[in-house]
Amino acid sequence: MAAPPSTRLQGMLQTAVQSVQWTYSLFWQLCPQQGILVWGDGYYNGAIKTRKTVLPIEVSAEEASLQRSQQLRELYDSLSAGESNQQTRRPCAALSPEDLTESEWFYLMCVSFSFPPGVGLPGKAYAKRQHVWLTGANEVDSKVFSRAILAKSARVQTVVCIPLLDGVVELGNTERVQEDIGFIHQVKSFFIDHHPPPPPKPALSEHSTSNLATSSVHPRFHSPPLPLTYAPLDPPLIANQIHMEEEQEQEQEEDEDDDDDDDDEEEAESDSEAHTGLNSEAQNPRVDHVARAAAEPSELMQLEMSEDIRLGSPDDGSNNMDPDFQLMVASQGGNPADQQQRVDSFRAESTRRWPLLQDPLGRSLQAPTSGGTGLEELTQDDTHYSQTVSTILQHQSNRWLESSSSSAAGCLMYSSQSSFSKWPLRPSDHHHQADATSQCLLKYILFTVPFLHSKYRDDNNSPKSATAADSASRFRKPTPQDELSANHVLAERRRREKLNERFIILRSLVPFVTKMDKASILGDTIEYVKQLRKNIQDLEARARQIEIDQRSRSSGDPQRSGAKAATDKRKLRIVEASGGAKGKAVDSVAVATPPPPAPPQPVAGVGVQVQVSIIESDALVELQCTHREGLLLDVMVVLRDHRVEVTAVQSSLTNGVFVAELRAKVKENVNGKKPSIVEVKRAIHQIIP
């Protein structure tokens, strides 16, 4: 079943993720050219940090989430632009990296991931055709979940991958959810209900002009059309007959040499007979098939297209069989020289047009370098590859029904949109496992060729002499512009965090704040500093007045001052007569001991003061009230119930007055909302005596 168009797919993803109230939903689709699962579409349903786009009308939450998903994709395209657009790529996006939450970063970075079948959660779900449920995605190792580091920062705890629509639907949640089969059926129902109608099943013959309609009008992958080549549905019957005659002649020659050969030659003969038997088993089904086709009077070839088979085109992404079919009939008549010439040309064309392939197990295959090879060169990997292709074709509900006359063999034109390559059955045309150099050469080409093309486009000149190793290393290294941009983003983030910490500290020093924004905090701080300066001036003036009053009192009481002077003189005489240590003792006796300070009395009628400030995710709570047992614990429990997690506490108790300062982190709920200052204050006042 082909993937639906983009708008319908996004609508299904939106309906599914909103119905289960999860954070995001993604669709991984199979890229026909690369054979891997890549990003198809997605919908973000999580928390939104800020909205920079000002809309003329009020929009609903669904429309806002849909616009947010589109803005995140535009931001990724903007950030992944080429070096030529380095200076102008940021303004084209409605968002900037500083405006995203951690969960939005996780959703954004998922666009850059791809998974071969069998690798990662989407790859395993696609290969096994079973759902994969991962709980605790932020706690597992990167080998289990490749995006574990991103999930840890975004607090994504549950990830589910469900194979649907010839791809994989992935849903993620920031909460821990246990596996539920009812959840899987519920998600599948949204996609099964939108099942597209099956394509028509036309009947094709030699003179038929019926075409198969492509199932998708919106191509997802674009690639240049393949050159028009021809692949035989079966190898030429003449070549099979000639090969069988050659084998019979070899068997007769071996039988004649049996009398004179020694034991070693007999063992070689047995090996040859074993290979010959294998070849006959491979050829006999094809001969019987041709014989049955010759006996049937029908000349109609039926092609039934199924939604399960994936034979399609690289250009339209629908992977349906090419609509343009032409039946070419090669006559078997003629002299033996023409027949032999056609066989040789078939061999040459098969060898020339076989591309460098890679089997499903990841091993590279390449064409033989020269003429026919013996059957003993058929390796186990080649046999496994042919059996795998045969099994896939046999398990499909669609089969080719071919009929032709006894004097003709049918050959099917290979379309430029078909994803099948030519597959001859002759042992001489089987392909051998490539050595390590071919795989290394393929990797070298993949790494170096894109870099060379980009270099020509930027420099507009021919390349100079440079080694291949230097080219590959330069390609793998990030450009200075990318490193500078990444460093700038990190530095800007650190600066913002440090600035927020400074504002939190400044807010804790100011006893009153009108608003919680940074400008209001600065304005209130300025007013508070002015008040402090005024208080200092008042205190200094009061101190001067007290000093003047003391001087006036001392001058108005001369007798007391004279007695004090006489006492000082007596002390001085005692010190001079008795010496240092004794004088000090007498002096200490002479000095009157001041009375001890009175114990502090408890303050009566202490007023309750509660100050709460919240800046982004940081919160500060200041509390002053009458003390009671367990008050601090009750305050922390109330804050936790309002999703305010306390990180630091400073408290003191003086004369029955309890003073506390609590620093905390504010968490968001499922809808991305944070508790307000009024709610926190009201909850604290309810528990204060």
Curated annotation (Swiss-Prot):
Compositional bias per record (Polar residues), positions renumbered to this chain: 206-217
Region feature (Basic motif): 483-496
Keyword Transcription regulation listed: yes
Broad class of the protein's primary localization: nucleus
Keywords of the record: Activator, DNA-binding, Nucleus, Transcription, Transcription regulation
Acidic residues: bias regions: 246-271
Protein origin, superkingdom: Eukaryota
Stretches the record annotates as Helix-loop-helix motif: 497-532
Gene Ontology molecular function terms on file: DNA binding; protein dimerization activity
GO cellular component: nucleus
Region (Disordered): 192-287, 458-489, 547-570
InterPro entries registered for this protein in UniProt: bHLH-TF_ACT-like_plant, bHLH_dom, HLH_DNA-bd_sf, MYC/MYB_N
Tissue spec: Expressed in the inner pericarp of maturing fruits.
One Pfam family named in its UniProt record: HLH
Subcellular localization(s) per the UniProt record: Nucleus
GO annotation terms (biological process): positive regulation of anthocyanin biosynthetic process; positive regulation of DNA-templated transcription
Annotated bHLH domain residues: 483-532
Record's function text: Transcription activator involved in the spatiotemporal regulation of anthocyanin biosynthesis specifically in the inner pericarp of red-fleshed kiwifruits. Functions in association with MYB123 to activate the promoters of LDOX (ANS) and F3GT1 that encode the dedicated enzymes for anthocyanin biosynthesis.
Subunit structure: Interacts with MYB123.
Sequence similarity: Belongs to the bHLH protein family.
Annotated protein name in UniProt: Transcription factor BHLH42
Organism: Actinidia chinensis var. chinensis
Taxonomic placement: Eukaryota, Viridiplantae, Streptophyta, Embryophyta, Tracheophyta
The gene coding this protein: BHLH42
